[in-house]
C-alpha cells in the first residue's frame, strides 16, 4: 500500500488522469484560496479531480512539470511538501511562476485529501486574460 509521500510524489509526477486515479472515490482536491478568484475551490472524486487537472495540464499551463520538489513531512498517512512551476499560460500568454504547498492525507493506499495553497495573484495571471484585473472587474 502506498504511503502519503509516495502518493504525493506520484501526483506531482503524473499526468492529469494518472494523478486523478490516485484519489479515493470519496477523495478531494482542495485549493481554498481559488475562492478568492471566484473559482471552485474543491473537487471531489477522481472524475471531477481529473477534469480540473486536465484543465490545468492542457489549457492553463500546457505541458507543465513541477520542479524544486521538497517533502518536509513524511508519515505513512500524511505528507507535506512544496513544488513549483515556471510555465507560460495557455490562457493569458504570461510566464507564471507558481509555488504550491500541498498537505496530503492518505487512507487505504489512496489520497483522501490533498489541500494545496498557492499564490492567487500568480494564479490570476495564468487563469484570466487580463490577470487580477479581470477578478477586480467582476466584483
Regions found by a protein language model. Give the residues of each.
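Short acidic-aromatic low-complexity motifs
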Residues: 1-28
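Hydrophobic alpha-helical core bundles mediating ligand binding, dimerization, or RNAP-core interactions
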Residues: 8-11, 23, 53, 85, ...
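Alpha-helix boundary/capping residues
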Residues: 11, 26, 56, 130-131
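Flexible, active-site-adjacent loop/turn segments at secondary-structure boundaries
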Residues: 21, 41, 94
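A solvent-exposed, acidic/Ser-Thr-rich amphipathic alpha-helical stretch
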Residues: 25-71
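A beta-strand edge to alpha-helix "cap/lid" segment located at domain peripheries
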Residues: 57-139
Amino acid at each position: 500500500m502506498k504511503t502519503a509521500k509516495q502518493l504525493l510524489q506520484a501526483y506531482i509526477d503524473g499526468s492529469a488522469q494518472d494523478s486523478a486515479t490516485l484519489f479515493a472515490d470519496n477523495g478531494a482536491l482542495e485549493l481554498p484560496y481559488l475562492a478568492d478568484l471566484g473559482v471552485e475551490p474543491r473537487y471531489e472524486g477522481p472524475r471531477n479531480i481529473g477534469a480540473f487537472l486536465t484543465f490545468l495540464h492542457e489549457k492553463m499551463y500546457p505541458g507543465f512539470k513541477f520542479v524544486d520538489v521538497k517533502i518536509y513531512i513524511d508519515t505513512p498517512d500524511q505528507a507535506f511538501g512544496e513544488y513549483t512551476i515556471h510555465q507560460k499560460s495557455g490562457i493569458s500568454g504570461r510566464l507564471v511562476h507558481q509555488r504550491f504547498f500541498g498537505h496530503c492525507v492518505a487512507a487505504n493506499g489512496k489520497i483522501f485529501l490533498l489541500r494545496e495553497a498557492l499564490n492567487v495573484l500568480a494564479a490570476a495571471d495564468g487563469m484570466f486574460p487580463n490577470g487580477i484585473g479581470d477578478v477586480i472587474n467582476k466584483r
